[in-house]
Amino acid sequence: MSTVNCQLSTRTPMAPKFAKGRETMIYKMLVINPGSTSTKVSYFENEKNIFTESIFHDAPELLKYPTANDQLPMRRKVLLDFLGKHNIDPGDIDVFIGRGGCAYSQKAGVMVIDRQLVEDTAKDLGGSDHPAKLGVMLAYDLCKVYGGKMYTVNPTNVDELCDYARPTGIAGLYRRAQTHVLNQKGIAAIHAKKLGKKYEDLNLIVCHVDGGITITAHCKGKMIDSTEGAGGDGPFTPTRLGSIPVMEVLQYLDQGHTTGEMRAMLSRSGGFVSHFGTSDAARVHAMVESGDPKAVTIWNTMIYQLCKSIGGMAAVLEGRVDGILLTGGLMRYDDILRGVERRCGWIAPVTVYPGECEQEAMADAVLAVLRGDAKANTYTGKPVFSGFPWEREA
C-alpha cells in the first residue's frame, strides 16, 4: 500500500483568512470531487457556482497508477490547472471542500478535515481504495499551503445500515456501508421538496448510475441498506466488476491472476474496461446504437443487474416504496430509464434526475456551517459499527 505517496505535512494548516460573524461575508469555496473516471472541480462564492469543470480520465490513463493514492499528484495538477485557467489565486480561497471516503465510517453530515482523518483515509482503514478519498487529501494538501478551512460532506462510507444489512455467511465478516452518499441524499432531499414532503417521511430507492453504480434503500431519512459498489457488489459498471460468485473469483485466481489484479477490477479495470478496453460509456453506447451484438448484450446486462438490485431494495423496504430515483451521468441514456421502468415500474414511480448535485450539496452544507446554521462533526477515529454486543462481550 503506497500510503507514503499522500505527501502529508506535519505543519498545522494556516488560520482562516476571513473574519467570523460577518453576515455579509462572501465565502470563496473550492469544491473537489474526484470520481472513478473524472475529477470535478467547482468554485463557489456563497451559493453561486462561479465555475465548474469535469475533467475525464480514460481507463488506460488511470491504470498507470497502482492505487488511488498514486493518483494524488495527477489530480493535484488538475486542480491547479483549473484555478490557473480561471485566474483564481488559491491563496484567496477561504474554504477547501473535498469529497471523501475510505477512513473509518462516520455519521452523515459535514465533517472537519484533520490530520487523523487524512491519515486514516490514505490507509483505507474503513473500506476499499476509491478515488473519492483524494478529495479529503487534496483539500488538506492545499489548505496547509494556502490557509483557510477544510471540510468533507457525506463521504462514501457514511454508515446508517440496519443490523440485518451487516452480517455475512462468514463469522466476523461484515458488509460495509460504501455508496454514493453525497449525491443520493442530495437528490432524495430535492425529490422530497418537489413532493412537498420531508426526506425523513419517505421510503425511497435511490440509484446513482455513472462510472460507479450503487443502489440504496432510504427509510425515513436513513440509508438502511445499499450495494457496496467499490467492493464488488451490485451491477457491473464502466469500471467495476460488480457481483460475481466467489467460486468464479477463486477459479480466476487459480488461473494465475493476482489479488492485485482483482482489487484493480473492483473500481478501475472491471466492467466496460474489461470487456471493451475503455471506461468511456459514450463509445460503448455508440456501439450499442450501431447494433454491435457484444455491446448490446453487455450494456443491457448492466441495466438488468441494476433492476435486480432495485428489486432487492424494494424487499428491504417491505414493498412500501414512495419512489425510485435514478441519478448520475449515465442517466443521459434513455434506454436505461426505459429498462428500469419496464422491470421495476410496478414497484413505485420512477423519476430521473440526470447528472448529479454533489458540488452544490457540498457547498450548501458547508455554507450552512460557516453561517452558524449547522454544526460540523469531528472525525472520531472509530467506526460507527465495530461488531454486535455478543461479539464485544466474548
Where are these regions (language model features)?
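Arg/Gly-rich low-complexity intrinsically disordered repeat tracts
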Residues: 1-10
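Glycine-rich phosphate-binding loop plus the immediately following alpha-helix
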Residues: 133-141, 152, 167, 172-203, ...
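Short beta-strand-loop/turn "lid" adjacent to the catalytic site in phosphate-handling enzymes
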Residues: 83-131, 149, 157-168
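Adenine-nucleotide phosphate-binding core of ATP-dependent small-molecule kinases
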Residues: 264-318
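Conserved phosphate-binding/catalytic loops in two-lobed NTP-binding clefts
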Residues: 334, 338-364
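Glycine-rich phosphate-binding loops at beta-strand->alpha-helix junctions
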Residues: 321-341
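Short glycine-rich, Thr/Ser-proximal phosphate-binding strand/loop in the N-terminal lobe
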Residues: 29-70
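Structural signal for terminal/edge beta-strands and the immediately following C-terminal loop/tail
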Residues: 354-394
